[in-house]
């Protein structure tokens, strides 16, 4: 029987600075809960964002790092007696994500991407446009399976006992956007 562990981050509060001027936007945020609890530096979550918006192009560059504050929500294939609503804190997972999003606006003479998303320009009439996009992100997960409860480790398949998972996600998108003024 295949085994499955599902994790989700615990809710947390962030505080940060976000500065925008004309076509450039820079943001930084940090988990407030980690500052308040004075946890060690390894556990802190951080986020950086840099966005550039012009009439034809939009670019987002981002970096996100999570702390070790997760919950195990679903367990399958280990024990039949584990209830379906099982939930337990887990501090053995850390995630780093780096990414880039690119957008091209076809009707850039009438449609304003910055007016819709960054409020840095005005658009005087209703207008729509087709938008093409490209996105790529690199994900690095550090997984310490020895932080799992003992009864899960005992039944864990050897193939699930990994320390690092790395993958890259890339996609191309095409859509339509419309601004009502």
Positions of predicted regions on the chain:
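Residues that define the transmembrane beta-barrel architecture of outer-membrane proteins
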Residues: 9-15, 42-46, 94-98, 126-128, ...
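Transmembrane beta-strands of outer-membrane beta-barrel proteins
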Residues: 26-28, 48, 57-61, 100, ...
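Transmembrane beta-barrel strands of outer-membrane/channel proteins
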Residues: 1, 19, 28-32, 52, ...
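Short loop/turn motifs that connect adjacent beta-strands in outer-membrane beta-barrel proteins
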Residues: 107-128, 142-143, 181
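Hydrophobic alpha-helical segments and helix pairs
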Residues: 67-120
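Surface-exposed strand-loop-strand hairpins of Gram-negative outer-membrane beta-barrel proteins
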Residues: 1-14, 25-41
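Extracellular/periplasm-exposed beta-strand and loop segments of Gram-negative cell-envelope proteins
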Residues: 6-10, 72-76, 84-97, 141-151, ...
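Residues on the lipid-exposed face of transmembrane beta-strands in outer-membrane beta-barrel proteins
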Residues: 15-21, 48-52, 100-106, 132-136, ...
């Amino acid at each position: 029987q295949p085994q499955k562990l599902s994790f989700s981050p615990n809710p947390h509060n962030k505080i940060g600075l976000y500065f925008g001027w004309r076509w450039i936007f820079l943001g930084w945020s940090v988990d407030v809960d980690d500052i308040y609890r004075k946890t060690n530096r390894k556990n802190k979550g951080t986020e950086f964002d840099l966005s550039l918006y012009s009439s034809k192009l939009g670019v987002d560059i981002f970096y996100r790092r999570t702390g070790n504050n997760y919950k195990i929500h679903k367990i399958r294939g280990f024990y039949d007696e584990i209830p379906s609503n099982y939930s337990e804190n887990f501090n053995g997972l850390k995630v780093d994500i780096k990414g880039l999003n690119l957008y091209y606006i076809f009707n850039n003479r009438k449609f304003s991407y910055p007016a819709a998303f960054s409020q840095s320009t005005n658009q005087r009439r209703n207008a729509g446009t087709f938008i093409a996009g490209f996105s790529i992100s690199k994900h690095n997960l550090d997984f310490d399976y020895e932080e799992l409860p003992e009864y899960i480790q005992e039944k864990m398949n050897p193939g699930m006992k990994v320390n690092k998972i790395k993958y890259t996600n890339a996609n191309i998108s095409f859509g339509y956007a419309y601004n009502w003024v």
